[in-house]
């Protein structure tokens, strides 16, 4: 346990561009969800060398508190997403990492 008592055992933050139109749905229990793909590109320094970092990651937003923010998310929106990652099984049976958002900020 950290001295600060921060819960950081599974924290992930990434800035990127929304690359897929958000899909909105409601679960049978009435919880609203929004899902989209976020694309990230950057240059990172690793062992003194520049390395290009690139990813496309599914993002899932659940619950009424954050769903309101998703109304203005469109393809091309630049956002910062903070949350936790977990594995979802795709329809083809493959495991895929998904970022479950707990905080979203729009980047100008």
UniProtKB/Swiss-Prot annotation:
It comes from the Bacteria. One of its GO terms (cellular component) is primosome complex. One of its GO terms (biological process) is DNA replication, synthesis of primer. Coiled coil: none annotated. GO terms for molecular function: single-stranded DNA binding. Keywords: DNA replication, DNA-binding, Primosome. Residues 8-108 form the SSB domain. It holds the Pfam family SSB_1. The keyword Protease does not apply. InterPro entries: NA-bd_OB-fold (IPR012340), Primosome_PriB/ssb (IPR000424), Prisomal_replication_PriB (IPR023646). Homodimer. Interacts with PriA and DnaT. Component of the replication restart primosome. Primosome assembly occurs via a 'hand-off' mechanism. PriA binds to replication forks, subsequently PriB then DnaT bind; DnaT then displaces ssDNA to generate the helicase loading substrate. Involved in the restart of stalled replication forks, which reloads the replicative helicase on sites other than the origin of replication; the PriA-PriB pathway is the major replication restart pathway. During primosome assembly it facilitates complex formation between PriA and DnaT on DNA; stabilizes PriA on DNA. Stimulates the DNA unwinding activity of PriA helicase. Belongs to the PriB family. This is Replication restart protein PriB. It comes from Haemophilus influenzae (strain PittEE). The lineage of its organism: Bacteria, Pseudomonadati, Pseudomonadota, Gammaproteobacteria, Pasteurellales.
